[in-house]
């Protein structure tokens, strides 16, 4: 294939001449388009977040733009997005250009994210990503600086004394990936809640059986109920500092109810924005619990985002907190059967909110038996303050469809 122009004397590399783009500039300063540096604290944060999922990063995508770096990968069959903002790096520079996408896998054995594996953590001191050339033919050069002990062979070649520490570097080169599309929700979540690590663990504790559906339900009495099989956990939600809360609070009614418990109520979930009633069921093939456990969160909590509209594709998003966010999205559906509405019965029981419902061994059903389904009978609706008797004492038939408010 002929080059678009003749090579100059001295022999520039053929890759320096590209169809439909400008040739690479000889000046290295002008040729550089972006640079990201991980060192000291930013490097430790990257290790902390990426090491647990390192086996899933071989075929990850790295997307650079003016906001920083986004890592897109698949963990346990679920899509995971890790945005690393510019303030989470030691330094970052970007010249205006379309986002640059690179596949982490270099040659089947090595990858651009191998530097963040646990086995290299003690040796790596600095990781630099440098992007050169013009879109759509940019080149990424990764340089990893690490320390190693001097050997007898190094001493014979004139290096420092044997046993001293020497800084070495290794490089990987990767060309831009041009056939890539990234899909992320562009709308704001309808409801957002902030959870601590302990509260998130209580939710994971409910998800015992892999085949049991997981249901998230937000009720009138400002509670979030999570159910799976015959287990459930109920949290109170504090909307005091939430934005755009359009539902009148019923906390005053709850304060008047006697709470027969000697234990203090656990810390409530903090509502960030939105305040709506909903019931969402995670899709059956969702690896919700397995994915969160694989991330090995330490003391950081998470933010639950509920995307309720449009009705055809509701989702639940979960974003971890410090050192930087890891985002994941789970497809959901609205229940087809009428479900419980109104107040949570657990709000008036002696069991504190945020605590799982404990059952005696004699009350436990056999593990191979499906949990009992709730039907819209009188008992169900009476427990939720729905009037079922008229003034003459005649019983009013229960509605067959869910009640919408």
From Swiss-Prot:
Database matches in Pfam families: Herpes_UL42
Recorded GO MF terms: DNA binding
Keyword DNA-binding attributed: yes
Region called Disordered, residue ranges: 354-376
Subcellular location: Host nucleus
One annotated GO biological process: DNA replication
Primary location: host cell
Keyword terms: DNA replication, DNA-binding, Host nucleus
Highest taxon above the source species: Viruses
Motif residue range(s): Bipartite nuclear localization signal: 358-373
A Gene Ontology term for the protein's cellular component: host cell nucleus
Quaternary assembly: Interacts with the DNA polymerase catalytic subunit. Interacts with the origin-binding protein.
Similarity field: Belongs to the herpesviridae DNA polymerase processivity factor family.
Record's function text: Plays an essential role in viral DNA replication by acting as the polymerase accessory subunit. Associates with the viral polymerase to increase its processivity and forms high-affinity direct interactions with DNA. Facilitates the origin-binding protein loading onto DNA thus increasing its ability to assemble into a functional complex capable of unwinding duplex DNA.
Protein name per the record: DNA polymerase processivity factor
Lineage summary: Viruses, Duplodnaviria, Heunggongvirae, Peploviricota, Herviviricetes
């Amino acid at each position: 294939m002929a080059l678009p122009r003749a090579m100059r004397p001295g022999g520039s590399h053929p890759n320096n001449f590209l169809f439909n783009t400008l040739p690479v500039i000889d000046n290295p300063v002008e040729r550089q388009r972006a640079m990201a540096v991980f060192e000291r604290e930013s490097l430790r944060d990257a290790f902390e977040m990426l090491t647990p999922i390192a086996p899933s990063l071989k075929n990850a995508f790295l997307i650079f733009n003016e906001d920083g770096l986004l890592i897109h990968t698949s963990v346990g069959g679920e899509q995971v997005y890790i945005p690393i903002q510019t303030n989470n790096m030691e330094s970052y520079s970007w010249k205006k250009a379309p986002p640059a996408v690179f596949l982490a896998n270099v040659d089947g054995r090595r990858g651009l994210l191998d530097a963040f594996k646990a086995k290299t953590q003690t040796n790596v001191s600095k990781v630099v990503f440098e992007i050169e050339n013009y879109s759509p033919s940019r080149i990424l050069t990764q340089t990893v600086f690490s320390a190693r002990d001097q050997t007898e062979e190094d001493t014979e070649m004139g290096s420092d004394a044997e046993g001293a520490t020497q800084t070495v570097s290794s490089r990987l080169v990767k060309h831009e990936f041009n056939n890539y599309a990234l899909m992320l929700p562009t709308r704001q979540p309808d409801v957002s809640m902030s959870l601590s690590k302990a509260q998130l663990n209580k939710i994971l504790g409910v998800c015992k059986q892999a085949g049991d559906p997981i249901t998230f339900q937000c009720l009138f009495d400002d509670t979030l109920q999570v159910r799976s099989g015959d287990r459930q956990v109920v949290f109170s939600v504090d909307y005091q500092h939430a934005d755009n809360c359009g539902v009148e609070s019923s906390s005053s009614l709850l304060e008047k109810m006697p709470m027969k418990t000697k234990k203090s109520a656990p810390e409530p979930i903090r509502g960030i924005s939105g305040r709506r009633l909903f019931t969402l069921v995670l899709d059956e093939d969702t690896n919700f619990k397995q994915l969160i456990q694989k991330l090995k969160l330490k003391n950081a909590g998470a933010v639950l985002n509920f995307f309720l509209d449009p009705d055809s594709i509701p989702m639940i998003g979960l974003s971890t907190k410090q050192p930087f966010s890891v985002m994941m999205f789970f497809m959901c559906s609205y229940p087809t059967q009428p479900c419980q509405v109104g107040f949570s019965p657990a709000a008036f029981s002696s069991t504190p909110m945020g605590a799982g419902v404990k059952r005696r061994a004699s009350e436990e059903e056999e593990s191979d038996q499906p949990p009992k389904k709730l039907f819209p009978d009188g008992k169900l609706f009476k427990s939720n303050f729905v009037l079922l008797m008229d003034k003459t004492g005649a019983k009013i038939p229960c509605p067959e469809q869910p009640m919408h408010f």
